[in-house]
Structures are given as structure tokens and as C-alpha cells.
Amino acid sequence: VIYMAQLKMFWINDKKVELLPLPEGYSFSTYKDEADKAAWVECCKNGLVGDDTKPEFFDDCIAGDEHCNPCTDCFFLDYNGEHIGTITAINQGGIGDMHMVGMKTEFRGKGLGKYLNNMCIYKLANEGVSHIYLTTDEWRKGAVKSYLTSGFLPVQYEMGMEERWEKVLEEYGIDSVDMLYEDCTLYKKIYRSSLAKRVKIGVVGARRGQTMLNYCKTGFNCDVVAICDNAPDFLAGAKEKYGEDGITYYDNFDEFIKHDMDGVVLANFANEHTPLAIKAMKAGKHVLSEVLPCQHMKEAVELVEAVEETGMIYAYAENYCYMPAPREMRIQYREGKLGKFEYGEGEYVHNCEPGWHGYSNCDPEHWRNTMSAFYYCTHSLGPLVHITGLRPVKVSGFEIPFNDRMYRMGAKAGAMAVEMVTLENGAVLKSIHGVGPSRNSVWYSVYGSKGRLESAREDDSDKEGVGTLFGNLDSYEGENNDNPKEMDTSDSLSKLAEDSGHGGSDFYTMYHFIQAIKGNRNAEIVDVYEAMDMFLPGHFGYLSAMNNNKSYDIPDLRDKAQRDIWRNDTTCTVKEKAGDMYIPSYSKGNPEIPDEVYEALKKKRENS
């Protein structure tokens, strides 16, 4: 099932309304008695109701609304005494509802819809409503055009709406129209597709950046204009795949950042994002950073302050937040259906041995071989933080020992890590992640005062793992009604995202970043503060593991006073970044891995 939200439109009551004079032979009447129910159904066929709809449906749809009085609110447009069209104008406590606008087939295409709209607007405006809303669909072309002509404006209330309306305007030959938010404030003026400004994007990292490049090349709201990579082979491969029409290629970031573009995607090495992000923002570019946001606390402080000082958009591409199950978990929690948040678990464990020779380039000093087990924590922890919006305040870390698999991979760290995190409301999270387990698992589970939500396990071959969500929720606290069921995880972007990487989640990170650049305050990005809330539990979790699992407070980098404490702290596992604050990547001291291991990995790479 592909979910597609209806279009929503508002008419703002800020102008005087007069009734339009009707053509000869036409008049208005209101609902009078039972006989009008059948006429109402006939007017609503061909789109609003099925051909077999009974007159009794009027009671459910119109008369059953507690705010509706059919005798004053349900209008008929009559031709020579026959009901040929209908509209219902309901005052929903100061907000107008234009409801069930229908016209008999033989009277369509005559421009009569404007008279129905006008009657509804006139009635509700004179009752003093703040605005009138309606919902409709693109395929009701005549109706949509008549609403626009009557002064209704599109509403940006769900992702994908702007692009859908651009297509509508293009089809109708309308150059532009104002678009509103749901609170009736102006979002911005939007333009037909052929006139809409496309966001210009540059991508750093031609390998991991391919998903972002593909989005830009096939997407509907941006173009890739520059690609940067210091690896000649990767840059040449990108040039062959994406061509040179409209794209400039760079092997130097400082030259790349001078290019005329709106935003930059950082898909380079995970421990090298911060310096490039800061340079980009200071050059006036918005930034989408792949995981991870920074290497140590000094970089964390510098990154936060660069965002604050420049005012540029920083979005953290924690794509697992947008996997179907955690994405829907967030919606359910934010709508209050889970109740008060109490506990959550996140797993991102990945047996990387089969591909490690490619991931790490067989290099003993590659960042993947020198990271602690705690470093790559945001795939497991990030979705839980994003679901709740709650800040982590304490963490205790536990390290799973270095094992034979990690030895064979040449990775100098524990096989996995566990963070036990306390949130600001007292709830607890368990996050487990790592590259050295024997099997894979991506899984999330959250508990609230009204029940539980969790994704399917990967080993359940009948389900789609993190693409499947199970819910067992009470309608109120204390109901204790055990009612497990599989839940729908589709939304208005699911169809567009289905061919994108990581279960479609890569589409969402790019889409929301582009929407943020375009000024949409509803864009669901992970900002720099939330990125730190996802990263810091891993950083301090490792310090905990090195100190007998001692609990560590997690700083709030929104607070400058707390930033000052960590401003010069370079504690990390990369020698050239840490200086005299260097710590080993394994809590018991870095394991000795002979050169022969890396030579064997090189042979494996050559033969693959």
C-alpha cells in the first residue's frame, strides 16, 4: 500500500466577500428533507462516493458531524429546480470546512464550481471564521483549478507537497502562488516546475557519495554541480558515470568550495568531516555531513560554534533515523500513542569481515582500523534519540573483547560496544553496535507508558527487518489490552524512496536537507545539537569502558559554559589528531597485528 496524502488548501478570511451573480436558470437552495439525500449522493458520484452509495451515507458524512446543521450548511446548486451540485460549509469552532464539493457529470466543465466555492466562502466568511480549509486530490483537476481561482492557497503540511504543487501549477499554466504553513503563516511563493529554482549541490566523496549523487541526478528538486575526491580512480569513475555536462570535478577541497553552489554533502572519511564542514559553512554553503560528525570534543565545540556563527544549515545524515520502522516509531511517539517514553533498545551490529579488505583499504592506519568499538555509535543510538527528542545525560560503556575476527580484519578494537544511556526524563536506552560480531542485526524497540513498538528481526524471512514495525499499544494508560499488530510504515515519500540506498533512508536525508535549504521549517533534519546528542554517548561511553564502566555525565553543547570545559580536549584514537591526549582504540591497549594480516587482506582484495 502506497500512502499519498491529500492536497490541503486554505482560504484566509482577510477580505470582503460578495456573492457572485448566477447564470440564468441557476439558483441555490439548502437541504430540506429526506428526499434531498438521494440528490446529494447523485451530485457526489464520479469521485467523492461510489456508484452504489446509498442515501443513508448522507447521515454519516454530513448530518453526523456535530458542528453541521444540514438545513443551514448543506447547499445545492439548482438548475431549473433540479439539484445538480452540492457543497457543505461547516463552521468547526471558528475554522471553516469546505466539505463534499460535488457536481453531476453532465454539468461539469461549465465553470460552475466557482459558484459553489463562492457560496461556501461567503457563508463562512460572514460567520467570522479565521480561515477555510479543504482537502482534495491532483486528479480532480477542474476542482483544484477552481479552488485556486477562488483564492484558496496550497498548504505545506507534509513532505512532498511542494513538489506536487509545482507539478499542478505547471499543468495549469500558473506561474506562481503563495504557499502557507498549517498555522496560516506564509511559507513562501512557489513556482511551476519549469520556473522553480533548483538547489545546487556539491558532493565530497565520489564513493559513498554515489547515493547522494544519484538523488541529485534523478531527484526533482536539486542538481549536482560539483564533485570532489582526492582519489584519482574514484574521481575518474564518477566522471565516467555522471558525465561532465553541468558538473565540475575537483581533487582539491579548497578549490571545490569556491564553486557556485548552495549546499555541500560530505561523504569523505568519517573522521575528517568537521574541518571540511566548518570551511564549507564559512564559505556560505549549507552542509549535509555523513556519519560521524566529529573526531573529538575540540572538533565538536568548533563545529557547533561554526553553525551558530555562520547561520548556515548543518544536517547530520544519520540515515537509520529514516528507516521505515524508526521513522514510524517517531510519528507514533510524537502523536502520543506510545505515552511517556520509558525505555528503548537499538542494535546496529554488522559482521564486516567479508568486505573489510575493501572498507579499510588494507591499511593498518585507516580510520576504520583505528576507531574504538564505541566510535560508530549513531546508527544504533541515533534513531532512539531522534524518536524521543530527549537529551542523553549519563552513560556507562561496556566493551566486547577483541576477537579472532577483528584480528583477521586488522581492526584494533573491541568487537562491539554497549552504551547504557540515561535520558533527561529518566528513561534508559541500550545501544549495541560493532563491526566484529558473527551475525548482523539492525533492530529497534521502544517502550512507553501505553505499550511497545519494535521492528522485525532480520532472521524473520517473512518480514523486512527494520522495514517492518510491530505495535502493541493501549488507547490509554492502564488499559492493559494486549493487542499486537503489524503497522503501516509508508508515507508520502515511500514510493520515491524505494530505490534509494539503505532501505530508502538515504533518500530522506537528502530530501529533508534540500527542503531545509529551500526554507521549509517542517524539514526533518538532524541538526548539529542533535548530532552531538547521538555522538557523545559513544565518546564518553568509551571513556567509561576504560575506567571500569564508571558513569559519565554527557555535556550539553547547546550551553557555551559547558563547551568551554571541552574546548581544547582532543582525546581520541587518532594520533595525529589527539596529540598528547591520544588513547588506544582498544581499552586494554592496542592489539599487535602483524603485517602479514594486511598482506593477506590485500591478496583477498586483488582476488575479489
Where are the predicted features?
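N-terminal Rossmann-like dinucleotide-binding module
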Residues: 192-243
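A conserved beta-strand-loop-helix scaffold within acyl/acetyltransferase catalytic domains
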Residues: 45-104
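Predominantly a Rossmann-like dinucleotide-binding segment in NAD(P)-dependent oxidoreductases
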Residues: 207, 313-315, 320-411
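Beta-loop-alpha module in the N-terminal Rossmann-like domain of NAD(P)-dependent dehydrogenases
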Residues: 244-306
